């Protein structure tokens, strides 16, 4: 394989630039040419493709976001969109593609491989909800950003003896809430993976004030419900504290990536190139117990594949990701 391309797709995540840099420089070290595709699959279909050099990716390792830009492009799920994208790849002489993004991006990589263009998925999302890997690119930075924000909220919360409900991102996963909540000493963490009783939350907050606490922090994963609605339910259940709501929002997707995300992205990007060099495709890279691994994107659960097809052609997730609820138990023991 002599010429490959790299793209970022879906929501951006800190560390994507570090992954792009690793793909480009590892490929050049392997004697390959590298092309960048702007704005994900939309750019592929539009032919927005250009050659990258080692200098093209200089000084981007510390930058958040993705300098190739990203976009959601549902049209690529259709055969017509895939064929248009493949036409552009052929036009530029591209033989393989590295796709950095979430599970939707992986589906596109799988389709490219089926059409004869080996593609490797690299997990880039702050949500940490991709199967086949312990951690995704961007998660550590998002947790650090959320922790820093909660630390600041704690300052004002304690000054006014208030209860704060802090909503963090994560889509349907509670990883950011759990990690940021524990790191910031939250009193209560509420995640989608665990049932909760609103009356128990009220009792826990009241018990804290009765023990002499001056404030309370509740970290809420966005996949549970909006923070404003959660606050209303707290009041309806009898909470009498001075309650405030903060939604951290997209600040969690920005900012300079942490050292861990930079190193993780560099390792994953380089590993993806090595797989393409071997002519392999239809795989997603990941990290398990600090070691690089790869899994088939599509297949059976027994084969270790991330996704499988039902008899009616629908894509389903094998062994869906769930946040580590041992962390939830840990927080309940520590937040007394």
UniProtKB/Swiss-Prot annotation:
GO terms for biological process: canonical glycolysis; fructose 1,6-bisphosphate metabolic process; fructose 6-phosphate metabolic process. Keywords: Allosteric enzyme, ATP-binding, Cytoplasm, Glycolysis, Kinase, Magnesium, Metal-binding, Nucleotide-binding, Transferase. The active site is at residue 127. HAMAP family: Phosphofructokinase_I_B1. This is ATP-dependent 6-phosphofructokinase. It comes from Streptococcus suis (strain 05ZYH33). InterPro entries: ATP_PFK, ATP_PFK_prok-type, PFKA_ATP_prok, Phosphofructokinase_CS, Phosphofructokinase_dom, PKF_sf. NCBIfam families: PFKA_ATP (TIGR02482), PRK03202.1 (NF002872). Coiled coil: none annotated. It comes from the Bacteria. Catalyzes the phosphorylation of D-fructose 6-phosphate to fructose 1,6-bisphosphate by ATP, the first committing step of glycolysis. Belongs to the phosphofructokinase type A (PFKA) family. ATP-dependent PFK group I subfamily. Prokaryotic clade 'B1' sub-subfamily.
